[in-house]
């Protein structure tokens, strides 16, 4: 009897010990980066940096991870990032060329098969974009059949992979969603495109059956871009209003979207992210302030994320300050001779067109200055104040040597891009702000419309 009790006790202890070891064993993330673009690589979980490693001159990095939770992570080697799945005890060795990021990315070591498969999923979706685009011209039934056939092939291939590789529930869930979500997003995009000619009204309800497969409240996917992209597309199609219809319906369209989010998503992280996205998208497109007031009132009744609410309110205030007739916001800049000056103290004897650029975006930079010089060839009544958004003054000055000089062009660099981007509501580098000679805002437009845009004196 005593021996039996001892045996039972020993079994319990061993079971507990094995479970403890399994839960507390280390994981490792290391590798080599060829042509590194940054001195650091970061491992993140849900947008929080868990670990950072210095990347040596030879491109080598190493991280030891204690008792890591199984799930979806991502790593950043700026300016790029990619997802990876880590299970407790994995030892992943990465190799990539930072110039050809995703295409060169390969994993070896414990846990590598699932991550190489995940990267292949992403790359295959990218390679299929042209084919998917060609399907958009089809009628609903043939379109769904084509998408379903492609999905069946992917699922069949994944089943074979699962047979040959041991995967836990979390890894399977992540990979299945990585396979399905882009295709389901394509269906939602198809629905949006067909709304305008009423094709959707005649579609059988079975067309939408894929929607039942996606839960909007999966915490593990709360920062997975394909998952969030799909939900955002779903919100577009929950309104009975056509996105391409009259602009005065745009407010109601977005109110329908946030109400759908409020009724369909209970996970606070996912809910706040989707609401934030919709709010930013709406505020940056809407031109009528009274509509923005209405939207903001309804948004704040739904959104409980204090940080997001403060951010959205600040965006609204900055948009209000950029209205026609107001003076351009007070931003501190640095001149070519490295003098600090506030934007409202820059003298101009002519109306000013403010443009923005980065030396990291070569094609945009070339296109921008080509448009400016083309404009000035026929119209010398305006000055261009070109604001660089980078932080390295010396590197900026080196780039200026290669930019054609013109007495109507002045160059500046932002002292604090974060502050400037918020005050200027700089959501893309194609934005232009037109003021009179004293800094009073006349109009806000896009660089692509510069050629046809009439600027009155």
Name each region found by the language model:
Residues 1-28, 444:
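Bacterial Sec-dependent N-terminal signal peptides
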Residues 19-171, 189:
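A non-transmembrane, solvent-exposed segment enriched in polar/low-complexity residues
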Residues 252-324:
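N-terminal targeting signals for export/organelle localization
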Residues 309-344, 407:
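N-terminal "domain-start" segment that seeds a small globular fold
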Residues 341-372, 382-387:
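Short active-site neighborhood of thiol/selenol oxidoreductases, capturing the structured segment around
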Residues 381-395, 405-417:
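Thiol-based oxidoreductase modules, predominantly thioredoxin-like and allied folds used
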Residues 400-433, 437:
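Short, internal strand/loop/helix patches
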Residues 428-431, 437-457:
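Non-catalytic, surface beta->alpha helical segment in thiol-disulfide oxidoreductase systems
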């Amino acid at each position: 009897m005593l021996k039996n009790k001892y045996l039972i006790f020993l079994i319990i202890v061993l079971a507990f010990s094995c479970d403890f070891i399994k839960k507390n064993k280390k994981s490792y993330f290391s590798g080599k980066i060829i042509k590194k673009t940054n001195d650091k690589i970061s491992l993140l979980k849900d947008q929080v940096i868990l670990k950072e490693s210095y990347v040596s001159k030879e491109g080598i990095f190493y991280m030891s991870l204690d008792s890591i939770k199984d799930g979806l992570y991502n790593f950043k080697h700026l300016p790029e990032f990619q997802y990876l799945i880590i299970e407790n005890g994995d030892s992943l060795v990465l190799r990539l060329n930072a110039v050809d990021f995703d295409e060169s990315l390969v994993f070896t070591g414990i846990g590598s098969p699932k991550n190489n498969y995940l990267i292949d999923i992403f790359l295959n979706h990218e390679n299929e974009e042209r084919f998917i685009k060609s399907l958009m011209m089809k009628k609903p039934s043939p379109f769904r059949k084509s998408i379903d056939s492609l999905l069946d092939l992917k699922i069949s291939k994944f089943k074979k992979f699962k047979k040959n590789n041991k995967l836990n529930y979390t890894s399977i869930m992540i990979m299945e969603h990585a396979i399905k979500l882009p295709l389901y997003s394509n269906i939602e995009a198809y629905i949006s495109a067909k709304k305008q000619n009423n094709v959707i009204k005649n579609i059988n309800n079975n067309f939408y059956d894929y929607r039942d497969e996606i839960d909007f409240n999966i915490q593990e996917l709360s920062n997975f871009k394909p998952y969030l992209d799909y939900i955002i597309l779903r919100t577009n199609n929950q309104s009975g209003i056509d996105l391409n219809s009259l602009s005065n319906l745009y407010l109601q369209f977005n109110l329908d979207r946030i109400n759908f989010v409020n009724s369909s998503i209970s996970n606070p992280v996912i809910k706040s992210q989707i609401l934030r996205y919709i709010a930013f998208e709406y505020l940056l497109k809407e031109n009528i302030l009274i509509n923005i007031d209405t939207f903001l009132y309804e948004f704040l009744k739904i959104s409980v994320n204090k940080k997001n609410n403060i951010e959205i309110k600040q965006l609204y205030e900055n948009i209000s300050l950029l209205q026609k007739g107001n003076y351009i916001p007070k931003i501190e800049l640095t001149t070519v001779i490295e003098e600090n000056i506030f934007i409202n103290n820059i003298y101009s004897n002519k109306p000013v067109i403010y443009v923005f650029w980065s030396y990291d975006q070569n094609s945009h930079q070339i296109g921008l200055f080509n448009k400016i010089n083309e404009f000035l060839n026929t119209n010398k009544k305006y000055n261009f104040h070109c604001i660089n958004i980078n932080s390295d003054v010396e590197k900026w000055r080196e780039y200026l040597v290669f930019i054609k000089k013109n007495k109507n062009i002045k160059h500046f660099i932002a002292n604090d891009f974060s502050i400037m981007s918020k005050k200027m509501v700089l959501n893309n580098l194609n934005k232009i702000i037109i003021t009179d000679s004293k800094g009073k805002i006349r109009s806000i437009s896009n660089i692509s419309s510069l050629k046809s845009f009439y600027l009155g004196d």
